[in-house]
Amino acid sequence: MHLNLKSLCSLTLISQAKTSNPFLSFSNCRPFSSLHSGSANLILMELLKEVAKEGSSASVGVAIRADQKSYSYKQLISSAQRICSLLCSTDLKASHKAGKQVTPALINGLSGHGHLGGARVGIVAKPSAEFVTGVLGTWLSGGVAVPLALSYPEAELLHVMTDSDISMILSTEDHQELMQKIAAKTAAQFSLIPPVPSSCSQEGAVDHLQTGDINTDSILHNTEISNENPALIVYTSGTTGKPKGVVHTHKSINAQVQTLAKAWEYTPADQFLHCLPLHHVHGLFNALFAPLYARSTVEFMPKFSVRGIWQRWRESYPTCETKVDDCITVFTGVPTMYTRLIQGYEAMDPELKEASASAAKQLRLMMCGSSALPIPVMQQWQTITGHRLLERYGMTEFVMAISNPLKGERKAGTVGKPFPGVEVRIVAEDENGSDTTGVGELCVRSPSLFKEYWRLPEVTKSSFTDDGFFKTGDAGKVDEDGYYVILGRTSADIMKVGGYKLSALEIESVLLEHPTVEECCVLGLPDKDYGEAVSAIIVPAAEAKKKGEEESKPAISLEELFSWAQHKLAPYKLPTRLFLWDSLPRNAMGKVNKKELKKKLTVEQGV
């Protein structure tokens, strides 16, 4: 059954500067449908039940650290239940229209048993406790969480929101102005996420959350779910044009986090330093959902900082024989991050180098993924820290499928072997057969496979083999030890830039909107820091070319193109290299052979 949240309730939480609690002000609220079933994520079922128990050790454990504050599991789940109640309650309208104060007692009395029927809820927040409670509250209320990228310009946000038919935006105050503006252009409602009180919070209006009061009956009710229900839509980076919505169910999420927690031995003693985006499966699953499932602690660093990471590790391990209580034990990043960390290390004075290397060596686990890790970077990192980075392989559609072992040989240049329960098939390019030794397209069948591409049934169907294997579009092979080697994309139109898979076609379509651009071709050229660099070959329009010649300057500069495009493309999609040509080499069918063009430029540019 498809229910549009707008038709169920128009609930808007808006900041009121003069009210004692600006996050509890409501307007135009109509009742949600209340059905006798909840839709919390399956991975939370046992955790929620355990936390709900009186005196549970799980309840007092630190789940999230952010902005120098700590948040327990009980506080997170209590706050998530309040968000569920806000989304699903019919009582809030009455209290607002009657001019009554919305009190903690009133909120505690809300049932939280509403069911959003799979309505999509956009989550817009920096990495924080509020982001986590926004997702959990959406799941508890029966909604589907759609994390929205903070780096997206307005045009891309509008595409994702319109495509997924988002009915409600949950946002923090720092993104309120932009998201209210965007919500006004769509059918979505807007709500602020109430701040989650930390362990040392003194916020009187929400003191009930400090103790983590939880309606146990409501939690237990809402964890009885249908695990085939959609839970999460994560948008791809746009590998075939516009980004596609990848729908994961409670079942696929559950399968993945259990697999990761077991394979990499996540425990309550682990403390993760998290500096990855939360609209990408690396940041969502590897570094957030799986640690929370294992009752670990996740410490958010909202923006990647070379100095900040090295400093946090040194604080964790002041000497080679000592550590603090909140010491970081696990770190996962993309190759570019490790390149930057190496550069930062090399710029240190000898004494700071010694302290930094000593601290890094004491972490339990360091992992790398989202794009190929250059072997020289792996070797440099191992020399500095003693860690041989654990590489693994995944995609938005199945999260993680292959990994080097936690214990055992981690082979440079490979991504390891399939996880238990995961099947990987290599299909030859002629598609007449498959084997485990030759080169071909990797196809994956896994319990964590996505349900579908959102509202793209034909694309979904064509992405699978008849026997249920997902076609990754990545070329690979298996070495003599059974380790998988990823050779790259099967299409020249796909680029991997700093961990993101980008579509050259999408970027081309935007650049062609520029009045100076007559023709363009976008491809990825090798880059030592980002894997590939977005490179644009442009044929200027005749008038622009003539004007440039008269003024003895290029028809368009990289700076001009960058400045213009940054309002239309996410930062990581912006061209960083520009070539101005008189024409593009095309075949008889009018197509540009990008593979040959890439080879030619790579040789000419010496990259």
UniProtKB/Swiss-Prot annotation:
Region (SBD1): 305-391
Localization, UniProt: Cytoplasm, Cytosol
Record GO biological process: fatty acid metabolic process
Gene3D superfamilies: 3.30.300.30, N-terminal domain of ligase-like
Pfam families tied to this protein: AMP-binding, AMP-binding_C
EC number: 6.2.1.-
Region described as SBD2: 392-453
A cellular component term, taken from the record's GO annotations: cytosol
GO molecular function: ATP binding; CoA-ligase activity; medium-chain fatty acid-CoA ligase activity
InterPro entries: AMP-bd_C, AMP-bd_C_sf, AMP-binding_CS, AMP-dep_synth/lig_dom, ANL_N_sf
Amino-acid positions noted as binding ATP in the UniProt annotation, renumbered to this chain: 236-244, 391-396, 474, 486-489, 591
UniProt KW Ligase keyword: yes
Domain of life the protein comes from: Eukaryota
Keywords: ATP-binding, Cytoplasm, Ligase, Nucleotide-binding
Known tissue expression: Mostly expressed at low levels in glandular trichomes (lupulin glands) after flowering, and, to a lower extent, in stems, leaves, flowers and cones.
Entry domain remark: Both substrate-binding domains (SBD1 and SBD2) are involved in the substrate recognition, and are sufficient to confer the substrate specificity.
Family of the protein in this entry: Belongs to the ATP-dependent AMP-binding enzyme family.
Name the UniProt record assigns to this protein: Probable CoA ligase CCL8
Organism per entry: Humulus lupulus
The encoding gene: CCL8
